[in-house]
Amino acid sequence: MRTEYCGQLRLSHVGQQVTLCGWVNRRRDLGSLIFIDMRDREGIVQVFFDPDRADALKLASELRNEFCIQVTGTVRARDAKNVNADMATGEIEVLASSLTIINRADSLPLDANHVNTEEARLKYRYLDLRRPEMAQRLKTRAKITSLVRRFMDDHGFLDIETPMLTKATPEGARDYLVPSRVHKGKFYALPQSPQLFKQLLMMSGFDRYYQIVKCFRDEDLRADRQPEFTQIDVETSFMTAPQVREVMEALVRHLWLEVKGVDLGDFPVMTFAEAERRYGSDKPDLRNPMELVDVADLLKSVEFAVFAGPANDPKGRVAALRVPGGAQLSRKQIDDYGNFVKIYGAKGLAYIKVNERAKGLDGINSPVAKFLTADIVEAILERTGAQDGDMIFFGADNKKVVADALGALRLKLGKDLSLTDEDKWAPLWVIDFPMFEDDGEGGLTAMHHPFTAPRDMTASELKTAPEEAVANAYDMVINGYEVGGGSVRIHNGEMQQTVFGILGINEQEQREKFGFLLDALKYGTPPHVGLAFGLDRLTMLLTGTDNIRDVIAFPKTTAAACLMTEAPSFANQAALTELGIQVVKKAENN
C-alpha cells in the first residue's frame, strides 16, 4: 500500500512519485489550497492539495485529525523561505495527486494541543502511542533489544528460554499465582526472575546464557516499577565477577554509544560502605557534587546532646553536608527541608550559614553556634571545604537514619538548586554489599537473594558470624538509578544450606521449596556468576524520561491495573468452579 514512510522522505526523493500511508496529524485549509501534516511511525511530512487535482482537493476538505489515509503524490523541494528546520522532512513536501480515506476518526478523547492526564493517556493508549515522542521511545526500545542480542551473540552467549509457569520460591516479593486446572488446589507462580533456572542451565553445561525475559512481582509500585517488567538476564560459568562486570560494562557502553552517541568511559568501582558513607545511598548519583562528611570526632565534647549523643554512640553518626551557595536559602526553605528529612526518620536539621569564611565563628549564622567553640567551627569549615555563601546541614542519629535523611536531602537540594549536572552521565559499579540485613523481627534477610555467595568465607565461618559476611555482589548504577545487579552464586550444597539456615528456612522447608536445586548441587556444579539488567529502566534513561510507563507499550498503573482493557477483571463462575476456586469477600468494617 505504501512505497515510502512519511518521515523518511528527503531531498533525494525530489521528483519521485510516492505512495504514503498514515494519519492526519494536522490540517490547514487555505481555501484554494489544503495542507496536512501526515504522520506515520517514522515521522511527519507536509502534504498539500491544489485546485489542479480537484477530486483530491475536494476529498481533502473532509479530513480531520487522526483520519487514516493513503496519499499518492510527487515529492517537491520547498522554497528556501518555506523550509522548516524543525522537521526532518522540512526541506520537502508532497504534492498530492490522489487521496483515499481508509478510515475516519470520531472526536478524539485526547487533545493534541494540551497536556492530557496520564489516566486518559493510559485508557486510550493506542491513541497516545501515535504521538511522535511515544513512537520514538518504543523505536528506541526496539533498537536497544536488537543491539543487546547482537552483542550477546557476538560474545558467545546462547539465548535460552526458561519457563513462565514455575514453582513459588521466596525471592523478596509476593508471587503472582496461577491455579492449575489439572492439579486441583495447586498453583504455579509466574517467575520473579529466571534465577534458579539460569543457575540450572550453568549446571547443565551452557556456560554463557542470556535471555530478554518478562518477570512478575506483586509488590507496591512507584513510578519506576511495574508488576510485569523485562530483564536482560545473564549467567556465566567459569568466569570471575570482575570478568563478568567487564563484559556487561562493555555492553552498556555499546548501548550508550549507539543510541546516544556518548562514550561513557570506564566505570569507577565503589564499595557499598563508601557509597553509604559519602552519598548516603547504595545507588549514588555522581552528577551531584555534594558529599556527606563525618564530623562526629569534632563534636563528642559539645554541650549539645543532639550532637554529642550520636557522636559518642558506636551505632551513631554525625555527618555534615555542604551546600554550595546554600546560604541564600530562606528560613521557610530551611524549615521545609527540616520537615523533609523527618520523612526519613530524622528529628530535625541543624545548620550553619557561612557568611564570611575567614572570620570563623564570627562569620557564621547558626542556631547551634552557641554550643560550638571557634576551634570546632574552624575544623568543621576546614573539613567540609566551606566557602563564603555556603550552607552546612547536619544529620545526627543512628547511622541508617543519617544516611537515609542526608542522602535524600542531597538529591533534593541537587535538583532544587540546580547543582546536579543534568547533561552528564555518571555510571559506576557498587560492590561488596552486606550479605544479610536485619529483617526487623530479630532475624536476618538476604540483601540480594539467598543464592548469592559470600566473599572469602567458608560455610562454618558464615554460620559463626553471618552479620559480618560481605556478599560477592555488585550493582551497576547510572545517574542514581540501579540499572542492573548480580553476584557470584553459591555452587556448593553445604554453603547453600548454611545460607538457608541463617535465613530461618529449616531443612524440611529447604527440601520442599529447593529440593531440586540442592539435588543439582550434588553433581559437579561449576562456579557461576550472573547479572540482570532492567530493560525498562535502561530504556527510560536512554530516552530521557523519568517514568517507566513511557517506555512500555501497554503498562499498568501504580495500582497494577490496565485502564484500557480494565484488567484485572472478575472471572466467570464456571471458570472458577472448574479450577476449584471460591472467592471470599473481605468483611467490611462496621
Swiss-Prot record:
Report which reactions are catalysed by this protein: tRNA(Asp) + L-aspartate + ATP = L-aspartyl-tRNA(Asp) + AMP + diphosphate
Residue positions binding ATP: R217, D218, E219, Q226, E482, G534, L535, D536, R537
Ranges for the region named Aspartate are: 195-198
CDD domains from the entry?
AspRS_core, EcAspRS_like_N
- EC class of the enzyme, as a word: ligase
Name its cellular compartments.
Cytoplasm
Q: Which PANTHER family match?
A: ASPARTATE--TRNA LIGASE, MITOCHONDRIAL, ASPARTYL/LYSYL-TRNA SYNTHETASE
What is this protein's name? Aspartate--tRNA ligase
Q: Which species does this protein come from?
A: Salmonella typhi
